[in-house]
Amino acid sequence: PLPRAVIRQLVACAGDAGKTVALRACGSEQELLDALRVAGQARMEIALIDPGSCVDSARLHRVLRDLPYPYVETHDDSVDRPERCLPNGLGHCIATVRGYCAQSYLLGLEIALEHLGCTEIQGDVHVGT
């Protein structure tokens, strides 16, 4: 699970941009697939996805190809212990963020918010255009 401090930062960063963030820790492939489906029904604007051990899942690949919203692939790995990433070309992946441990989620959110046109972000990191 994400450290509480990171969760607070995610919520604050989204709030500063006038957005809300829904956090969901998925314990299985099916939970991840269900969360993506529900997000689509809720008209999610964008998602941060950490595929974890599901990077090779054919079911996840199919769902990502058909997502009605873009996503940022995010990993909480470190530079010296990189996790495997999803294959290229799965839906509308606007970026992959990895190597910054839990801070990767904050960087991913900053990228997502910039993609949505939220350029007045109050965070410490600017991901640039």
What do the PLM-derived regions correspond to, one by one?
Residues 5, 12, 80-129:
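Short, glycine-/small-residue-rich phosphate/pyrophosphate-handling segment
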Residues 9-20:
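Short helix-loop-beta junction
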Residues 17, 67, 89-92:
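Short, structured coil segments at secondary-structure junctions
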Residues 20-31:
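Short beta->alpha junction loops
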Residues 35-38, 49-69:
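Short Gly/Thr/Asp-enriched flexible loops that form oxyanion-binding sites at enzyme active sites
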Residues 66-82:
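Short, acidic/small-residue loops that bind anionic groups at enzyme active sites
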